[in-house]
Amino acid sequence: MKNGNAGVDEGRRAALKTMGAGAIGASIGADLFGTPSASAATAAPGASARAATPGAYNILFILTDQERYFRPGELPAGYRLPAHESLAQRGTVFVNHQINSCVCTPSRSVLYTDRHIQHTKMFDNTNFPWISSMSTELPTVGDMLRDAGYYTAYKGKWHLTKEFETVNDLGTPTKIFTKEMEAYGFSDYFGVGDIIAHDQGGYLHDGIISAMGVNWLRGRGMTLATQGKPWFLAVNLVNPHDIMFIDTDRPGEPVQSRNILGHIRPEPADPLYARQWPFDLPA
């Protein structure tokens, strides 16, 4: 067992075991852009009531980067996200999460350890010299679910280990860091350096991340199913993070692009980005 507050860790493990038996993987029929349905609202407090369900649910956890929650009426008229809606109807939606930090590394450290940043020590992004890698002594969701009997796997963006983003060049990767991710409680990681996503990072890499997730489900996931072993797969996408690096300057007006630390680009020349949705941005 990794170091930490034993009482707190045991409480987290007990909660995760209960959730694994029902709450996380159950289909609760929630509306992604509103409150859960009546059946979901009554089912949510009843995780203990579902704990007696035989077997454990497989858990597919999909994490996007920098995607805000839209309340009813905030999206433009006619705008729909059918894939989001399908996931909401078939899976579990968390509508009461409060963001702990608007910076990537601190926020991800809390999501994957259930501890605040004063405990994870991840106060800023790992690509800054004053931040070290997250300690492998800190139990993660992967560690806790492994204790509960799950096979745990991870795909995509991590941004919690310094070495992941400094050793490899994206064009000529030499190390995939599978062994290093085992120390954080996750198997089957395959990275070409950490995909921390600067300009067009999501556009370039999310297809690869999604494909790795699908490949895992068709391969390892099916094998585990025949063995009767429950699994947890975390698929970590980059977008809509690309918006941080969009160049909105008009031709001949280098206003935004002056005196900045990173690279920015206009939107890709892709039909996906061609459609316009004219509506007022939040103040």
Describe the role of every protein-language-model region.
Residues 74-79, 91-113, 154-165, 236-241:
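Short, solvent-exposed turn/loop segments enriched in Gly/Ser/Thr/Pro and often Arg
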Residues 55-58, 92-95, 148-151, 228-231, ...:
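Loop/turn elements at helix/coil->beta-strand transitions in domains of secreted/extracellular proteins
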Residues 110-231, 243-262:
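Catalytic-site neighborhoods of secreted/periplasmic enzymes
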Residues 54-55, 77-81, 98-103, 128-138, ...:
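A short beta-strand-to-alpha-helix junction
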Residues 3-8, 14-37, 41:
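N-terminal export signals
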Residues 46-95, 101:
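Active-site-proximal N-terminal segment of extracellular/periplasmic enzymes that hydrolyze or transfer
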Residues 51-57, 66-78, 223-229, 237-283:
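Active-site-proximal cap/lid insertion segments
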